[in-house]
Design a protein with these regions (language model features):
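Beta-lactam-recognizing serine transpeptidase/beta-lactamase-like catalytic domain environment
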Residues: 1-33, 38-168
Length: 168
């Protein structure tokens, strides 16, 4: 029994690896591409796109302003013609960056929040709230937030709940 308490003390004081942290409920991580189906729903529901609209992904999305910055799709050669359906199946960053730009951060945050992201789930064992994407002054991060990058952090249980809500 003393060995158990000694090992427990060692594990509980390990702040770097945190071996006792329930990562499914209390770990928060950038959602990445797991957020794309929810962003697709938001884009369709808010009316910024339709199921039949086609975009051409050249592999590099350019921010439509005088700033001129942009981002690369994971497929540097581009996906070519993409619709919302092919953007989800091909995990097309270009498409979702454009949808994020069209919706803006406020709309994205509203939809993500409506799916329970950025809030505790209420499960009995407790969980982390995570955080919705933020908009630092002078920066438009909506294109990045739309495909799970930028500043948002969610727990795996939050994402599982959000995706279950989407498909039910």
């Amino acid at each position: 029994l003393s060995r158990y308490f000694q090992d427990y003390q060692t594990l509980s004081s390990d702040s770097e690896g945190r071996p006792l942290l329930n990562r499914a409920t209390n770990g928060t991580y950038p959602p990445g591409s797991t957020l794309k189906p929810i962003t697709a729903f938001a884009a369709l529901d808010s009316g910024v796109t339709t199921v039949s609209e086609t975009l051409f992904d050249s592999g590099h999305w350019t921010y439509p302003s005088s700033w001129g910055g942009g981002l690369n799709c994971w497929n540097r050669a581009g996906h070519g013609k993409v619709t919302v359906t092919s953007a989800i199946t091909g995990s097309c960053n270009y498409y979702f960056a454009e949808m994020g730009y069209r919706m803006g951060m406020t709309t994205l945050r509203d939809y993500y929040s409506a799916f329970g992201l950025g809030s505790k789930t209420g499960i009995e064992i407790g969980d982390a709230a995570g955080s919705l994407p933020s908009q630092p002054e002078g920066q438009d991060l909506a294109p990045w937030a739309a495909f799970g990058q930028a500043t948002q952090l969610y727990s795996p249980i939050q994402l599982a709940n959000a995706l279950a809500t989407l498909v039910s």
